[in-house]
Swiss-Prot record:
Substrate binds at L132, L133, S134, G135, G136, D165, G178, N274. It comes from Borreliella burgdorferi (strain ATCC 35210 / DSM 4680 / CIP 102532 / B31). It is an enzyme of class 2 (transferase). Fe cation binds at H110, H114, D298. This is tRNA N6-adenosine threonylcarbamoyltransferase. SUPFAM superfamilies: Actin-like ATPase domain. Its EC number is 2.3.1.234.
Length: 346
């Protein structure tokens, strides 16, 4: 079965063709560089650029896959969560194709797509712990299957990638912040500043993260946390921030691994490409899987791959389904016992 995967939840316009849930025939992505001058994503610009680009990106994906549009068996599209304007562009485009081609459509949750992405590169046996790190999401999950996911912990404020973007914007390090801070920090001393690392002691927040304190310390209270006589340079700020940002993840992650007794870890999301983070994770001495870069960031292949499996289990989504920018109380929404209700129609 050939599946056309469409992903437009944020600023990347992505279309892919995947066969039988795992064989990637094409995976085309158009980055919107217009946002760089604003040091962040402007929703109105993102949705307009998706409208302008999605047809040509789709044509490129089909051409790369050597596949005619009539040979597509299923259309998978991200319907939640994300920027509502961007989601609507992708969803309406997918609906138009489904109606005109008389093909089934399956709506996919963006978070579940990221959690599925590593499975397209490596054969990984369930269960495992997943760590999703991106500009919009930071969470730890326990996975027993592609649709049996329990969110153990998540950020209570900024996502990890979002904190990188905000610090980079303040110090004029460029956008997106993640790769720029990683590069700038290579020539810095990570011990120049001892920024605070947040860990929670309450049971209900045992696996959760927080980045607001770290972000505030780095942007507004810099000299308060200076611990060495090194100069206050961008390199030293970047290195010290990056160190604290990833130390922020380690304690909740260790807790999840210990409490679940699952010694298998899968890293997903754009931040997963950071090599400094990978060095930190590797020190945990557990079996760890990293997807390739093109599957770390937003992409259509993960939507098509998961869409294939969701369709076989749950069938198609109703054509009248709407996009949803947010998921209320999502720590409970993703528990395995609610899977059919929450995942079958995304």
């Amino acid at each position: 079965m050939k599946v056309l995967g469409i992903e437009t939840s944020c600023d990347d316009c992505c279309v892919a063709v995947v066969e039988n849930g795992i064989h990637i025939l094409s995976n085309i992505k158009l980055n919107q560089t217009e946002h760089k001058k604003y040091y962040g994503i402007v929703p109105e610009i993102a949705s307009r650029l998706h409208t302008e680009a999605i047809m040509s990106v789709c044509i490129k994906a089909l051409k790369k896959a050597n596949t005619k549009i009539s040979e597509i068996d299923l259309i998978a599209v991200t319907s939640r969560p994300g920027l509502i304007g961007s989601l609507i562009v992708g969803l309406n485009f997918a609906k138009g194709l489904a109606i005109s081609l008389k093909k089934p459509i399956i709506c996919i949750d963006h978070i579940l797509g990221h959690l599925y992405a590593p499975l397209m590169h490596s054969k990984i046996e369930y269960p495992f712990i997943s760590l999703l790190l991106s500009g919009g999401h930071t969470l730890i999950a326990k996975q027993k299957n592609f649709d049996d996911v329990e969110i153990l912990g998540r950020t209570l404020d900024d996502a990890c990638g979002e904190a990188f973007d905000k610090v980079a914007k303040h110090y004029d390090m460029g956008f997106p912040g993640g790769p720029n801070i990683e590069q700038i920090s290579k020539n810095g001393d990570e011990n120049t500043f001892q920024f605070p690392v947040t860990t929670f002691k309450k049971k209900e927040n045992w696996y959760d993260f927080s980045y607001s304190g770290l972000k505030t310390a780095c942007i507004h209270q810099l000299e308060k946390f200076k611990s060495k006589d090194n100069p206050t340079t961008k390199n030293n700020i970047a290195a010290s921030f990056q160190k604290a940002a990833f130390e922020n993840l380690i304690t909740p992650l260790k807790r999840a691994i210990k409490d679940t007794q699952i010694n298998k870890l899968v890293i997903a999301g754009g931040v997963a490409s950071n090599l400094y983070l990978r060095e930190k994770i590797d020190k945990l001495k557990i079996q760890t899987y990293y997807p390739p870069l093109d599957l770390c960031t937003d992409n259509g292949a993960m939507i098509a791959g998961l869409g294939f499996n969701m369709y076989l289990k749950y069938g198609e989504s109703p054509i009248e389904i709407d996009a949803n920018s947010r998921i209320e109380n999502y720590k409970n929404q993703y528990r395995g016992k609610n899977n059919e209700k929450n995942f079958s129609n995304a």
